[in-house]
Each structure stands twice: as structure tokens, then as C-alpha cells.
Design a protein with these regions (language model features):
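Active-site loop-to-helix "anion-binding N-cap" substructures in soluble metabolic enzymes
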Residues: 1-399
Length: 399
């Protein structure tokens, strides 16, 4: 059985190491409001410092679309990293070129530099071979520790690997592959999967893949309204994808055939006048079964919370991807936060599968009580679907 080579498997003392991180953090006026992605990269960086490597950090921030824009600069990240590492992190105001090469040539063992945003060049997202070669020129070894962009074949996530050797994963990517891979493919059973969010079309391939592995699948969020239509229920003005009714019906049938429990919300919180921008909902009520005309479903109801919580408590492994309702609005967050609380308090291996679920569990205050939180959004979903991730497939394997 082969596995991806990790930084633990190589000697990088005195070597220049190009580390692709995911420092795509929220920045406003030079201030970082959530540094969890920076913190997630620290174990890999600290290991390389201790090994005496010369560490060249690379990342994107936002979508500058190939233009140099000050608001997308990684300078604030360099400052934050210096604080966390208790040592200087030199910020370079470009990511390729002679001045960058000259600065890198002056590095001593244990030094850390951060390159400017790779997406200031459109060649990054084009996976341009010439641009990848210029990035690779800076180093000898490639470490990918950016799981959040592993599903993208970009110059700094995949292209550089053609020019550097060895190519290995950092601790963050290693953990992601272990939890989203091994622990969902060979889980301690029963495995309960909770899927929420807005669109069935985004998650249908994941549902299909997980029907092969799960003992119970719970559906919440706006996705559940499309499944309600598939079961012949009315959903009022709730968000749905009528074109996905056939695939929803097929998923329900496949679950029955496989003996997988497939739980949909028996009741919902519905509102009359949802205004997301203002964070208001107007009149609200609970509907069991059908939602009446003029009402919009925004969260799961108390009976759903009870049903879903029971399934979570009976599990040994829980994978959660996607909120139960519009958790950003206080009136509609009870379902999501109740599920977060149940997962936190249950005796389970809990895996939070990226994106909005991580945001929701952070807001709920239970983040420190879960086993593992994925840093990937789209990457987590594609990996759970069984797709090959370009940023992982370029790495060396070891048997």
C-alpha cells in the first residue's frame, strides 16, 4: 500500500525548500480577521526551521486576476507569521525575477521568506510552464501544504513539481489525506455523514460516493427542499433545484437498496420575509412535513434536531459538510449550532469537511471539541467524491 511522501521522510537540512501554503485569509485595511489558515501551516514551517532548511513560502490571496493590487498583498501575512514563529519572516515584494533570486541566494539555514501573491501573475492559474520554472528556480525541494488549492492544477501547486525533487506533502496535507481518506474509507463504524448547504448539484457526486461508505446519511440545509420535492412534499418559497429531482430520487432509491439510513428533516423553520443583507426574517413558524405557500424554509426544526442528534450519538465516526440552515442570521442558526453541539459532546471521531461547516463550528464555539477540521472547501468535496487532486497527484509516493 503506497502513501504520499511527507516532509518526515526526507532530509532538508541546508536545502532551499519551496512550500506552497494556503494563506488565503480575510484581510481588510491590512488587518487579518481570521488567521486559522496561517496557524494551520505552522507545524510544517516549524519542522523545516528545526531541520535547518531555507524556507521559501508561497501562496495566493483572493482573486487579483493577474494584476498587482495592494489589497491582495501578502505583506500582512508575513507580519502575522513573524509573530507566531518568534523570528523574522522576510517579505519579498515579488515571487519571481532576479531581485527575488538574489534575496533567496543570501538565505541562511533556518531563514524564512514569504513571496508576494502568486496570483499577481495570470500565468499562475494558467499553470504556465515558464512561470512554474521561474518559481522552481528558487528552490531544490517542493512541499505542498495547501490542501485548499490541491484541486487546482496551478503553477505553484502542480507545475513546480516537474522541476523539483523530492516533491512531498507537509503535515497539514498529510492530515487532510488521512482524515478525509482513510478515516472515511475505513471508518470506525457506524459512519454517519451529515450533508448540508444550498445545492444538491454541488453535492450529488459526494452523496453518491458516500452511499458506498456510510451507514447513515443526514441531509439538511436548502438541499433538503429538493429532496422534499422528490418525496412529493410542498416546500412553499424555499430554495430548491427542481431539475435535480431525478438525481435526488435516485439517491433515495440507492440508499434503500444499500441499506443506508437516509434521513431528511421531518420539520423546518420557515419565515415570511427573509432579508439576508439586513439579517432579518419577519414572521416565523415551524412546519412539519409540507411547507405552505408564501413561507420559505431557512433551518431545520426541533424534531429534526432530535432525530439527527440521535443518529450522531449512535455513530463512531461523523463526517459533516455543510450547514443545516442560514446560520449567518441569528434567527436561523439553531439547527446548525445544535448539530455542532451534539457532535462536540458525542463520543465520536468527528471530521468537519471544510467550507461553511468550519465557519459554522467556529461561530458555534465548539471548534476545539472536534477531532479534525478540514481546511479545504472544493478540495474536500472533490477528494470525498474520489477525484484525483492535481496538487496531490504530483507528489512522490512511498510504499
Amino acid at each position: 500500500m503506497s502513501r504520499i511522501k511527507s516532509i518526515k521522510d526526507i532530509n532538508c537540512s541546508g536545502k532551499r525548500v519551496f512550500v506552497r501554503c494556503d494563506f488565503n485569509v480575510p484581510v481588510a485595511n491590512g488587518e487579518i480577521s481570521d488567521d486559522s489558515r496561517i496557524v494551520a501551516a505552522l507545524p510544517t514551517i516549524r519542522h523545516l526551521i528545526a531541520e535547518g532548511a531555507k524556507i521559501i513560502l508561497s501562496s495566493h490571496l483572493g482573486r487579483p486576476k493577474g494584476e498587482k493590487k495592494a489589497e491582495y498583498s501578502l505583506a500582512p501575512v508575513a507580519r502575522a507569521l513573524s509573530g507566531h514563529l518568534n523570528q523574522p519572516v522576510t517579505f519579498l515584494d515579488d515571487c519571481i525575477g532576479e531581485s527575488v533570486e538574489a534575496k533567496v541566494a543570501e538565505m541562511k539555514d533556518g531563514d524564512v521568506v514569504l513571496l508576494e501573491n502568486v496570483r499577481f501573475y495570470k500565468e499562475e492559474t494558467d499553470n504556465d510552464p515558464g512561470f512554474a520554472a521561474q518559481l522552481a528556480k528558487l528552490a531544490e525541494i517542493f512541499v505542498n501544504d495547501a490542501f485548499g488549492t490541491a484541486h487546482r492544477a496551478h503553477a505553484s501547486t502542480a507545475g513546480v513539481a516537474k522541476h523539483l525533487s523530492p516533491c512531498v506533502c507537509g503535515f497539514l496535507v498529510e492530515n487532510e489525506l488521512a482524515y478525509l481518506g482513510d478515516k472515511t474509507s475505513n471508518p470506525e463504524r457506524p459512519l454517519t455523514v451529515i450533508l448540508g448547504g444550498a445545492k444538491v448539484s454541488d453535492k450529488i457526486k459526494v452523496i453518491d460516493a458516500l452511499l458506498e461508505k456510510a451507514d447513515t446519511i443526514i441531509i439538511g440545509g436548502a438541499m433538503a427542499y429538493t429532496f422534499a420535492l422528490a418525496e412529493g412534499r410542498t416546500i412553499g418559497e424555499s430554495l430548491s433545484e427542481p431539475e435535480c429531482i431525478p438525481v435526488a430520487k435516485a439517491a433515495i432509491a440507492k440508499a434503500k437498496e444499500k441499506g443506508v439510513k437516509f434521513l431528511l428533516p421531518p420539520d423546518n423553520l420557515a419565515v415570511k420575509d427573509l432579508n439576508f443583507g439586513a439579517g432579518t426574517v419577519g414572521e416565523q413558524t415551524f412546519f412539519e412535513g409540507n411547507i405552505e405557500e408564501g413561507w420559505e424554509g431557512v433551518d431545520i426544526g426541533p424534531k429534526s434536531i432530535e432525530l439527527f442528534s440521535e443518529a450522531i450519538k449512535q455513530a463512531k465516526t461523523v463526517l459533516w459538510n455543510g450547514p443545516m440552515g442560514i446560520f449567518e442570521i441569528a434567527a436561523c442558526n439553531k439547527g446548525t449550532f445544535a448539530i455542532a453541539k451534539t457532535i462536540a459532546e458525542a463520543d465520536v471521531c468527528s471530521i468537519i469537511g471544510g467550507g461553511d461547516s468550519v465557519k459554522a463550528i467556529n461561530m458555534s464555539g465548539y471548534a476545539d471539541k472536534v477531532t479534525f477540521m478540514s481546511t479545504g472547501g472544493g478540495a474536500s468535496l472533490e477528494f470525498l467524491e474520489g477525484k484525483e487532486l492535481p496538487g496531490v497527484s504530483v507528489l512522490d509516493t512511498i510504499s
